């Protein structure tokens, strides 16, 4: 439950979901929704499927008819597209009207003729809403039937001819109906076709990303840029390019037959539209590289898939001279060769390429990744469960919002419909994902649709997002909460609303799920052939851009700002607020150890004589029976875990504003966090922030230096840097070795323990001799400039 007075905590709810009512309650819930929709509240809709019409009369003098259909229910109406000169039109459009906003008991389906000035009335069908049948899944879809068109007075003829017939399917269903995603909803009917497309619920899938490993080994018989017959005299490099990804080798020697042996990793995206362009360049001057040979390689045809980390054979490729990247790419696309540039030269380059499908291509932050599977399907593990998320609604969004939600887990993205013209934001849409690893996170974000005009020029407004880690969920339990939506802006922290979610994880393979806790988080290749952290971050950014570009090309597109917000593209940027939060997390991490040290110090100083006496007794028992030490420690851990079970977290974790230092952040710190890279601020602001960063870094530098000093003092014990101290230490070590050899271990342990726990009257207020000895040891601090 939410803590009193806190506006950023979870609020637990108890909506009447079939999944929470139990079998008996679900049977009495007056719904026949399929089991896949038991995580949302049933919402009834009136569906009107306009299929086609026949034998429509001509209304114009010209004898032409441009028919369209207008579906009216009170003040709501939907209009089909008009078809030119077609007396037997086919529309196949479905309209959905929410029964929660029912304004009339009569449904009118009117056929009209599109005209320049005033559209002509052709005929209509009037149905009583109370007579419309219910058809709720798992029932089969309702079959359409023919209805006779009549005029406004009920007549069936016009100038001696019938008004024709229209085929309709009219039924009352729920959001579980298969027609729901593609239906034209009542609030969206006035929009254009382009604007309407951006309001529908859709499912998207991320493109399949694979690492492409390219080894540039060597080249031979190169010809210089200035003379087409002589070898190059300046150093030569190889440039690797695929799409917007560019890599360069170091200069190779000798220039005519250079050897590089450089290895690069690129991100490839099926169906591999971008070829691999390898260009050998001569460094003719500083900052000026002239191409002396080029090869364009289609990735799909030339790069083998390496599923088992086997050694891939290298190949020699002929280099073409005088061909531009555009010409070569055109040849690859069309499959033809330009005769002028297709001459085979003696120059060759030695390459090794492979598609490393045994890796997982990271396209999101590793801290809240939703997918950890390999690119190769045959190496993937079987699913361990199912994640079901019901996006119920939102509240307190403020303003005139047209919100929609986007949820991302694994490769599957889902987008809810856009709610238009309503203050009661209720989606009640349910989605499912297969779960392969519990150490993953689902992200649900809310946006305000700014592109209802269909132009696509404006960016959709970010309202907030929610992350739920699956490992924190109990199996088969339905969590229903209002999650706070917050926006961090240069002006400060702002609560933008609350998102109502229902979440349930169902385990289908308990043994595999528990065994996963002992397996590596990432696929095996990430550990046997690791990629450096810097390179991995660079590849992750490229993968994010590829996903955003590919999803932006879908129809309707999932906009780039939406994808980048969910993938958290800017999470790697510097933030003083995040730095403070991470520092406090580190301090909090050691708070338990500090508390234990204080408690032990109190024991040694006899602040509580009874507790100290009990510790003496326990210590003597453990010395007499050392075989009980490990069992006592693990029994103590077990008892602590059992004791904490009563106070275990009952709600999933959410974004903590205090932990994030969002409320305490200063305006200038937030302004710096949202600054562009490189900075776009004036020089005096940048200078002030630089000085502040120097001050913080100076304190960090001092702490790091102190830590290094303590370690260096330990190293100097045996280094003879201080010959007297080392001689004393090794002499002491020899004496201790002899004493420990001659004295039983239990006697030594008892004496050492009693000395450590001695009464304060037997203690000196000055530092002990070992402490003083250690403080006097030399370190390397006096060797620094």
PLM features per residue range, with description:
Residues 2-18, 34-36, 51-54, 68, ...:
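C2 and C2-like phospholipid-binding beta-sandwich domains
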Residues 589-595, 606-645:
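Core alpha-helical transmembrane segments of integral membrane proteins
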Residues 572-609, 649-737, 759-785:
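Multipass alpha-helical transmembrane domains of eukaryotic endomembrane proteins
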Residues 96-104, 265-274, 432-440:
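Short Pro-Gly-centered beta-turn/loop motif in secreted/extracellular proteins
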Residues 53-54, 217-222, 392-396, 508, ...:
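Hydrophobic lipid-interacting interfaces of membrane-associated proteins
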Residues 6-46, 183-211, 363-386:
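Intrinsically disordered, low-complexity PEST-like regions enriched in Ser/Thr and acidic residues
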Residues 45-88, 211, 215-257, 284, ...:
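Calcium-regulated, polybasic anionic-phospholipid
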Residues 619-634, 721, 735-753:
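Membrane-lumen (extracellular) interface motif
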């Amino acid at each position: 439950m939410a803590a009193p007075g806190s506006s950023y905590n979870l609020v637990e709810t108890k909506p009447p979901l079939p999944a929470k009512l139990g079998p008996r309650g679900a049977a009495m819930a007056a719904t026949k929704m399929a089991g896949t929709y038991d995580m949302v509240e049933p919402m009834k809709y009136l569906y009107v499927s306009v299929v086609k019409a026949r034998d429509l009369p001509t209304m114009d003098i010209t004898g032409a008819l441009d028919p369209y259909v207008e579906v009216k229910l009170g003040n709501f109406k939907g209009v089909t597209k008009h078809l030119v000169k077609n007396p037997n039109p086919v529309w196949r459009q479905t309209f959905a009207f929410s029964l929660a906003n029912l304004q009339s008991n009569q449904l009118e389906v009117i056929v009209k003729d599109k005209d320049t000035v005033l559209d002509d009335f052709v005929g209509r069908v009037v149905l009583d809403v109370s007579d419309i049948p219910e058809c709720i899944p798992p029932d089969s879809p309702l079959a359409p039937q023919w209805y006779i068109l009549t005029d406004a007075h009920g007549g069936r003829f016009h100038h001696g001819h019938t008004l024709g017939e229209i085929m309709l399917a009219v039924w009352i269903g729920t959001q579980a109906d298969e027609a729901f995603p593609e239906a034209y909803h009542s609030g969206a009917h006035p929009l254009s076709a382009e604007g309407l497309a951006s309001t529908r619920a859709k499912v998207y899938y991320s493109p399949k990303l694979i690492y492409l490993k390219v080894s540039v080994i060597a080249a031979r018989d190169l010809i210089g840029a200035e003379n087409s017959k002589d070898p190059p005299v300046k150093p030569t490099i190889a440039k690797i390019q695929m799409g917007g990804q560019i890599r360069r080798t170091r200069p190779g020697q000798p220039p005519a037959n250079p050897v590089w042996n450089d290895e690069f990793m690129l991100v490839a995206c099926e169906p591999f539209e971008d070829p691999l362009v390898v260009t050998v360049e001569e460094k003719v001057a500083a900052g000026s590289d002239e191409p002396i040979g080029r090869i364009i390689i289609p990735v799909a045809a030339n790069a083998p898939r390496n599923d088992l980390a086997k050694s891939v054979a290298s190949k020699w490729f002929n280099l073409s001279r005088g061909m531009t990247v555009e010409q070569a790419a055109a040849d690859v696309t069309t499959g033809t060769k330009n005769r002028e540039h297709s001459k085979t030269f003696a120059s060759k380059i030695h390459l090794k390429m492979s598609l490393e499908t045994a890796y997982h291509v990271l396209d999101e932050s590793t801290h809240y990744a939703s997918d950890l599977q390999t690119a190769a399907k045959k190496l993937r593990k079987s699913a361990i469960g199912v994640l079901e998320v019901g996006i119920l609604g939102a509240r307190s969004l403020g303003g005139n919002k047209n919100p929609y939600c986007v949820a991302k887990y694994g490769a599957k993205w889902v987008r809810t419909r856009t709610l238009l013209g309503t203050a009661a934001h209720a989606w009640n849409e349910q989605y499912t994902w297969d779960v392969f690893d519990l150490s993953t996170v689902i992200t649900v974000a809310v946006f305000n649709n700014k592109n209802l005009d269909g132009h696509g020029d404006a960016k959709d407004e970010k309202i907030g997002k929610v992350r739920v880690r699956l490992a924190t969920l109990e199996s088969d339990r339905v969590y229903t909460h209002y999650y706070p939506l917050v926006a961090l802006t240069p002006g400060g922290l702002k609560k933008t609303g609350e998102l109502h979610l229902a979440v349930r994880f169902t385990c289908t393979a308990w043994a595999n799920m528990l065994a996963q806790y002992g397996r590596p988080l990432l696929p095996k290749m990430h550990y046997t052939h690791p990629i450096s952290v810097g390179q991995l971050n660079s590849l992750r950014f490229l993968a994010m851009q590829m996903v955003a570009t590919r999803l932006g090309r879908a129809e309707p597109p999932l906009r780039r700002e939406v994808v980048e917000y969910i993938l958290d593209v800017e999470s790697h940027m510097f933030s003083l607020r995040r730095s403070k939060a991470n520092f406090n997390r580190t301090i909090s991490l050691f708070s338990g150890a500090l508390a234990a040290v204080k408690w032990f110090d109190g024991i040694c100083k006899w602040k509580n004589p009874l507790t100290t006496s009990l510790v003496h007794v326990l210590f003597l028992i453990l010395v007499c029976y050392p075989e009980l030490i490990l069992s006592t420690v693990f029994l103590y851990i077990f008892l602590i875990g059992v004791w904490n079970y009563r106070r275990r977290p009952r709600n999933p974790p959410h974004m903590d504003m205090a932990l994030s230092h969002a409320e305490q952040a200063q305006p200038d710190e937030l302004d710096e966090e949202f600054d562009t890279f490189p900075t776009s601020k004036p020089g005096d602001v940048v200078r002030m922030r630089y000085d502040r960063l120097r001050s913080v870094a100076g304190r960090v530098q001092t702490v790091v230096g102190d830590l290094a000093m303590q370690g260096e003092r330990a190293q100097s014990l045996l280094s003879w840097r201080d010959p007297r101290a080392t001689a004393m230490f090794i002499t002491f070590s020899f004496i201790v070795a002899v004493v420990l050899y001659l004295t039983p271990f239990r006697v030594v342990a008892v004496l050492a323990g009693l000395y450590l726990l001695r009464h304060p009257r037997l203690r000196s207020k000055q530092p002990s001799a070992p402490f003083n000895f250690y403080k006097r040891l030399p370190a390397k601090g006096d060797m620094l400039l």
